[in-house]
Regions:
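N-terminal secretory signal peptides and thylakoid transit peptides that target proteins
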Residues: 1-15
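Active-site acidic/histidine proton-transfer and metal-coordination neighborhood
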Residues: 11-13, 17-23, 110-205, 284
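C-terminal segment of N-terminal export signals and the immediately downstream linker at the start
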Residues: 23-57
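Conserved, mostly hydrophobic/aromatic
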Residues: 38, 58, 66, 93, ...
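Short, acidic/polar
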Residues: 47-58, 114-124, 217-223
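Catalytic domains of carbohydrate-active enzymes, especially glycoside hydrolases
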Residues: 53-71, 129-130
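Acidic/histidine-rich catalytic cores of soluble enzymes
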Residues: 65, 166-254
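Glycine-rich, proline-tolerant flexible connector loops at the mouths of alpha/beta enzymes
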Residues: 68-90
Length: 300
C-alpha cells in the first residue's frame, strides 16, 4: 500500500497546491489504499481440493488480501491450513502477491473455559502470517443459543483479556458478528449493545458482517454514528432481494452498499473482505463478479 508521501508524489501535487480539506484528503487516502480481500471460507471446498490453484485463481481475479480461518479440524481445513503450516502458507501467499490482514481463529475453548493456552498458540500463527487482526469468528455456543445479559458481560470480560494478550503480541483483537447478537434481552438491551459498552475500545475492534446486521433489521449507518471508529473490518456480502436468508453476489441484492461505503471513514474501516457463505454458481465466477462490482462501484 502507498504511503501518504507516495500518494502525493504520484498525484503530481504538493502540499502547497493541495486545495482540499483534511477530511476529504483522508477519504481519498482510504479509497486509494483499499485492497479488496476475500474471506477464504467462501472457497473452502476448493481449498481442500487444491490450495495452490485456489489461491492462484484468487490472485488472478485481482484480490490482494485474504482472511484465513484456522483451528476447525479435518472437515474444514485439514491439518493447519489445508495441509500447510503457517510458514508454508505465508510463503505461498507471498508467491501470489497476497497478504492476510486478518484471520478467524477457533476460540470455542477459550470462550468456554477461559484457558489462554490455545490463544497463545494461535497468536503465534497470526504473527507468522503477518496478520494485523486476530478475529473471534463466533460467540460461545451457550451464549449463542441462550444469550443473557450476564452471559454477554462474561464474554466481554473474556474479550478484554484476550485483547490485552493480542496487544502485547502486536495484534488487535476483533469480533465478527452474526444476527443473534442483536436479539433483545433484559431491559431492552441487545448482546451487541453489551459488547460495545463493556469492552475496551483500545482492546477490541469489530468486524461487522453487513449481511447479518441487515438480516437482524439493524441499519449499519446508525451503528457507525453511535460507535464511531469501532468497525475496522467488514464482511461484504449481499442479500437476495426476495429472501433475507439467502446470500447472493455483491451488487445483485438488496443491501445499499454505495451508501455504506460512503461512511467507511465514520466506521473506522481498514479492511473489507468479500464473503458468500453459500454459492449457487461456479465459485470463482461468483467471487469474480462480487470483486468486479466492489472495485468498479465502491472502491474508487
Amino acid at each position: 500500500m502507498n504511503s501518504r508521501r507516495d500518494f502525493i508524489k504520484k498525484s503530481g501535487i504538493g502540499f502547497a497546491g493541495l486545495l482540499i480539506t483534511p477530511s476529504i484528503f483522508n477519504n481519498i487516502l482510504l479509497d486509494s489504499k483499499q485492497d479488496i480481500g476475500i474471506q477464504l471460507f467462501t472457497v473452502r471446498e476448493q481449498l481442500n481440493q487444491d490450495v495452490k490453484l485456489t489461491l492462484k485463481k484468487i490472485a488472478d481475479i485481482g484480490f490482494k488480501q485474504v482472511e484465513t480461518f484456522y483451528g476447525y479440524g479435518d472437515k474444514m481445513s485439514g491439518k493447519g491450513f489445508w495441509g500447510l503450516d503457517a510458514k508454508e502458507l505465508a510463503q505461498l501467499l507471498k508467491t501470489y502477491g497476497l497478504k492476510s490482514g486478518s484471520g478467524h481463529y477457533n476460540t470455542t475453548q477459550y470462550l468456554t473455559d477461559g484457558n489462554t493456552e490455545v490463544l497463545k498458540q494461535q497468536i503465534e500463527v497470526a504473527n507468522t502470517l503477518s496478520q494485523k487482526y486476530y478475529t473471534i469468528p463466533a460467540m460461545a455456543p451457550n451464549v449463542r443459543q441462550n444469550g443473557t445479559v450476564d452471559g454477554y458481560k462474561k464474554m466481554a470480560d473474556l474479550f478484554n483479556k484476550a485483547g490485552e494478550l493480542c496487544k502485547n503480541n502486536g495484534l488487535t483483537l476483533a469480533y465478527h458478528n452474526h444476527a443473534f447478537e442483536f436479539a433483545t434481552l433484559e431491559h431492552k438491551q441487545t448482546g451487541f449493545d453489551i459488547l460495545l459498552k463493556e469492552t475496551d475500545i483500545k482492546l477490541l475492534k469489530f468486524e461487522l458482517d453487513i449481511f447479518w446486521v441487515v438480516n437482524a433489521g439493524i441499519d449499519p449507518i446508525t451503528l457507525f454514528k453511535q460507535n464511531e471508529g469501532r468497525f475496522a473490518m467488514w464482511h461484504v456480502k449481499d442479500m437476495d432481494k426476495t429472501d433475507n436468508k439467502v446470500f447472493t453476489e455483491v451488487g445483485t441484492g438488496r443491501i445499499d452498499y454505495k451508501t455504506i461505503f460512503e461512511n467507511r471513514k465514520l466506521a473506522g474501516n481498514k479492511f473489507i473482505f468479500i464473503e458468500q457463505d453459500v454459492i449457487k454458481k461456479d465459485p470463482f465466477e461468483s467471487i469474480a463478479q462480487s470483486f468486479s462490482y466492489v472495485k468498479q462501484n465502491l472502491v474508487k
